[in-house]
Structure formats: C-alpha cells, structure tokens
C-alpha cells in the first residue's frame, strides 16, 4: 500500500483589529522622558550590573535625598523599569530585566560624556572604561579585549549581532571549568570602546567563571571590577592578553 501524502493544513491569521482594542503604537517618548532625568538615569546606569541595591546607596549615586530618591524609584518601578525585593525591613531595587540594561547601554553609546572636573571623577571614569560588569557580563576595555582575543583564536565567530561558540571554544571553556557552555551570546555595543563585547548567556557564563577563578575582583563600586594578579597570569597564558596593573 502506497504511503499517503500528508497535506499541510492551513493556518488562519486574524489581521482584523481586536474588538475593544485600546492600545496604540508604542510611546517611545514616555520611556525616554523617564530616563531623561539625570537622577533616574544615574540610578539605571548604576544598576546595569544586575545587582539589587537599597535606596540609601542609590540616593548617594544620584546625589539626592532619601525622600527624593523614593519618588524616582516609585516612578521607575511603576513604569516597569525596576523591580523591588524585600529583605527583612529593607527594600532592594534592581533592573526588571536584561532588556533594560541593554537599552541603557545602547543610549550610553550615543550619549555625550560628562566633563571630568575632579580627580575622583577621573578615577571613576577610568575604572569604568577599563573594566566593568553589565548585567553579569564584562564590558569596557577588558570585555572588548577578551572578546577580540577569542575571535582571533577562533573560539567564537560573529554572525550579525550574535557570537557563536565554536568547537574549539567549547573545548577551551570546558578546560576553564565551564561544563556544557552556552553555544551563543549577544554582541553588545560597548559605550566606552565603541566596539562590541560578548554578552548574553555565553558572556555571563564566562564572566562568572572568571570571578570563580579569582581572576576578577569587585571593587567597592558595584560596576567596577579589577583584574587580580592571578587574572593577569591567567589571561596572559590563555589569551595572550597583557593587562596593565590597576
């Protein structure tokens, strides 16, 4: 008996407006207006590393009072930019998701830089430009440098806005101690270097392992990271990267 040929069924798509539909096009201006306030912009930028911080620390970052920061945080939470977590009697705020961090980083790549007016600001800007975290992955000169070294060694390939892990890259990451590494990551445009660094699940996995190996160390500021002496040796041996001492 001859096998029967299966005829694909039609898929019906309703392109008529839904009854009672009230939502129109996206209001980009409303989202931009929330980020246009310098204090709220400072809060969002400080939280791009993915961690949760209390209002007291965010008030210091934004340079405003506790009562004022509460108003800003309420607006950002209401708009869906932030989520709040409770720890005992305290509240901690974090970005609602990686898409918020990506939006902040994308705007930062287009934004002018603040003029540096003090030694403290100069050191802060230098540290952020050298190495920082963005929602769990590395950014700055270190993040871009590691990404470009991996590309040069055939550990990853770039296809559009995606970095794909090669077989050689998977073997290398397993050698570093990452079992079953993610096979892809995003190409995130670095606002300070104007070149892409490795983001997404692959970037987060690699960054997390570098912290576990004590090659990286967090500073008192949440986003800034420094390379340890072990990290200098490890990055030189594995990727031929020479990292200047902090």
Pin down the residues of each PLM region.
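N-terminal helix-turn-helix DNA-binding core of bacterial DNA-binding proteins
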Residues: 26-65, 91-93, 126, 133-134
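Beta-hairpin "wing" of winged helix-turn-helix
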Residues: 77-87, 91-94, 159-160, 219-220
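Short, Lys/Arg-enriched C-terminal cap helix and immediately downstream tail that follows
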Residues: 40, 55, 80-82, 88-89, ...
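Amphipathic alpha-helical dimerization/coiled-coil segments
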Residues: 2-27, 49, 101-158, 176-221, ...
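Basic, amphipathic "hinge/linker" alpha-helix immediately C-terminal to the N-terminal HTH DNA-binding motif
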Residues: 85-110, 165, 169-172, 231
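Canonical helix-turn-helix DNA-binding module
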Residues: 55-82
